[in-house]
Regions:
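C-terminal "lid/loop" region of Rossmann-like NAD(P)-dependent oxidoreductases
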Residues: 179-183, 192-198, 203-223, 265-272
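Catalytic helix-loop patch of NAD(P)-dependent Rossmann-fold dehydrogenases
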Residues: 25-43, 47, 52-53, 57, ...
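Conserved C-terminal active-site "lid" loop/helix of NAD(P)H-dependent oxidoreductases
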Residues: 157, 164, 180-181, 216-238, ...
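Alpha-helical substrate-binding/gating segment
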Residues: 104, 131-143, 154-182, 199
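Amphipathic terminal alpha-helices
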Residues: 243-278
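Glycine-rich "substrate-gating" loop/helix at the edge of Rossmann-like oxidoreductase active sites
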Residues: 81-84, 115-127, 147-159, 186-190
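NAD(P)H-binding glycine-rich loop region in Rossmannoid oxidoreductase-like domains
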Residues: 1-32
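Non-catalytic, hydrophobic alpha-helical segments
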Residues: 160, 164, 184, 194-197, ...
Length: 278
């Protein structure tokens, strides 16, 4: 009904159950949201003649993780050890199946996008490193981390968002050339271990302290990197901020929020720093 009323030209699908450890506790919900949510959306697209382009945003964790040092490319195999990762791989497979079976022949162009570990102000989710760090800092508590040597491709939230919008525009104007999977990750130097992130944040916030959780943990990937060469070459998309800048902006946003600042005035300069790309 919402699709019929809105009659959109372009659809961006970002809704998800986004947490790995939560997926162990609630696997049925995770698959229902991440897999059947994609199916339901694409069925709605099929029944909405106005739609010409669709972008399904999944995750870097959709790849079959081989725990190697090389960044994953878009043509690597889908996989996933845990319910969250595998549900996103399923969403990718559903996307490809609907493209081949229904949407391409109907003139609807669909692509998928895979970003890294996105950070930035306003993320209040539980079980995420930087929100957990900020909550512990504000409460004067010790930060407990579970996987200090796990490496992730960290990036500021505006970076992949620009990639998504650029890709959606090209899908709408040049459809078939861009109807495929795309990575939007940071430069390889910004793929760092959790311990590096925590130590950097603590160097900027001397009152912060942390320790490792000694309890057994559920399985999570140890090494994860993305190769975004295709987006750089074909879309002209490149990361603009390194990891230190991204972390600094995230801390500044949070401190401004604590002071009661008008957050649009805080966030808009961050957007302008990425100009002319956004």
């Amino acid at each position: 009904q919402a699709m019929r009323e809105a009659r959109p030209d372009v659809v961006l699908h970002l809704a998800a159950q986004p947490l790995v450890r939560y997926s162990y506790a609630e696997p049925v919900e995770t698959y229902a949201v991440n897999v059947m949510g994609t199916v339901n959306l694409l069925e709605a697209v099929r029944q909405t003649p106005s739609v010409k382009a669709v972008l399904n945003v999944t995750t870097d964790k959709c790849y079959e993780n081989r725990e190697w040092v090389w960044p994953y490319r878009e043509n690597e195999a889908m996989g996933g050890f845990d319910p969250y990762s595998s549900s996103k791989a399923c969403s990718e497979i559903v996307t490809a199946a609907y493209r081949n079976s229904f949407l391409d022949s109907a003139g609807v162009k669909i692509a998928s996008a895979r970003a890294g570990n996105v950070i930035g102000g306003g993320d209040w989710a539980t079980d995420r490193l930087i929100p957990d760090f900020l909550r512990a800092l504000d409460a004067g508590q010790l930060l407990i981390i579970r996987s200090p040597f796990a490496t992730r491709p960290w990036q500021y939230v505006l970076e992949p968002l620009f990639g998504y919008l650029s890709l959606a525009e090209r899908l709408f104007t040049d459809g078939s050339t861009f109807a495929e999977a795309w990575n939007f990750g940071p430069d390889e130097a910004d793929s760092q271990p959790v311990k590096w992130i925590v130590e950097y944040l603590c160097s900027k916030q001397p009152d912060a302290a942390w320790q490792c959780d000694a309890l057994p943990q559920v399985h999570e990937a140890n090494i994860l990197k993305l190769d975004s060469s295709k987006a750089k070459a074909r879309l002209g998309w490149i990361p603009r901020w390194n990891l230190q800048m991204a972390l600094g902006m995230t801390l500044d946003w949070h401190q401004s929020w604590k002071r009661g600042a008008e957050m649009a005035s805080v966030s808009l300069p961050a957007k302008s720093l990425l100009s002319p790309v956004i």
